[in-house]
């Protein structure tokens, strides 16, 4: 898929992603991991699922809830839910996505 195929996201140069087309723009920063809150868990960084808007913690966090969510639901792409970060990651294609200009 060409890097310009996604209206909201472009695939980083040299990468291929079959999931970028039609993804919504990231909806901004989040405050907490929805999965850590009920168990009193700690998180390092937050990721937002672009399929269902679920907010979960990154792989540097003890519980790695974003990856667990992607695996359990087959939702392929998460975006950073951190302030001043504008990128997304496609799990199946291991591709970095950046906002389209």
What are these regions (language model features)?
Residues 41-51:
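Canonical RING-type zinc finger of E3 ubiquitin-protein ligases
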Residues 1-7:
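Extended, low-complexity, charged intrinsically disordered regions
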Residues 8-9, 13-21, 27-34, 39, ...:
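Cys/His-rich, Zn2+-coordinating zinc-finger modules
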Residues 2, 52-54:
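Structured catalytic/translocation cores of nucleotide/phosphate-coupled proteins
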């Amino acid at each position: 898929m060409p890097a310009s195929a996604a209206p909201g996201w472009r695939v980083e140069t040299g990468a291929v992603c079959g999931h970028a087309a039609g993804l919504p723009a990231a909806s901004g920063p989040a405050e907490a991991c929805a999965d850590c809150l009920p168990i009193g868990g700690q998180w390092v960084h937050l990721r937002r699922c672009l399929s269902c808007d679920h907010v979960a913690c990154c792989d540097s966090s003890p519980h790695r809830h974003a990856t667990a969510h992607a695996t359990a639901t087959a939702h392929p792409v998460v975006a950073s839910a951190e302030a001043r970060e504008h990128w997304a990651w496609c799990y199946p294609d291991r591709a970095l996505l950046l906002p389209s200009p």
